[in-house]
Amino acid sequence: MAEENVIYVGNKPVTNYVLAVMTQFSEGADEVKLVARGRAISRAVDVAEFIRNNVMPEVEVKDIEIGTEEIETEEGDTISVSTIAITLAKPSE
């Protein structure tokens, strides 16, 4: 998947990310990957479900990857942050 088809979910409203996904699909992308860490994970799930249930019901969840990233703080400690990557795909015709 091309890097331009990846949307990093952060603190913006869900509608911003829904619009970004719709834009990617309208520009010809077959797949779009939503990537989030920490507190933004629930927002990424909300975006995927909003797209599937309200905007583009033909879109399918192709893959969900979960994991943990080790991040070093300014104090030198290491903390673990949960991650998720949700791949949405248009059905093949």
From Swiss-Prot:
Cellular component terms per the entry's GO annotation: chromosome; cytoplasm
Subcellular location: Cytoplasm; Chromosome
Cross-referenced Pfam families: Alba
Key word Isomerase present: no
Top-level taxon in the UniProt lineage: Archaea
Record carries keyword Cell membrane: no
Stated family: Belongs to the histone-like Alba family.
NCBIfam families registered for this protein in UniProt: DNA-binding protein Alba, PRK04015.1
Function recorded in the entry: Binds double-stranded DNA tightly but without sequence specificity. Involved in DNA compaction.
Protein name: DNA/RNA-binding protein Alba 2
Organism: Methanopyrus kandleri (strain AV19 / DSM 6324 / JCM 9639 / NBRC 100938)
